[in-house]
Amino acid sequence: MKKRDKILQEAKARLVAAFGDKIKDVILFGSRAWGKPHRWSDWDFLVVVRGAYDWQTVRTIRFIMADIDLDFDVFTQTLVVSEMELTNSLRGRQPVFTDAIQNGVYA
């Protein structure tokens, strides 16, 4: 298994272990997903959640991803968005989200 796929699957497994079916998708996007990273490229993740979320949810997700950083010796950047935001808000239409949804690698 590629390192990319291993990290992606592990991230999803840890998030689902913490949040259950509240986690809809974990998507890798950016240079790591599209095969054009350089040595110091970060790992960009979009976590799509079902239902509402708050700052505590975002903090816990980022703590889980920080453990991924340490365990795999990588640097992750993680964005969190809800299904509702993606379909019903201006925030959900931002190019960073639409690009990740359309072109990212799903766990």
Tell where the protein language model's regions lie, with residue ranges.
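Catalytic core of pol beta-like nucleotidyltransferases
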Residues: 1-25, 34-38, 49-107
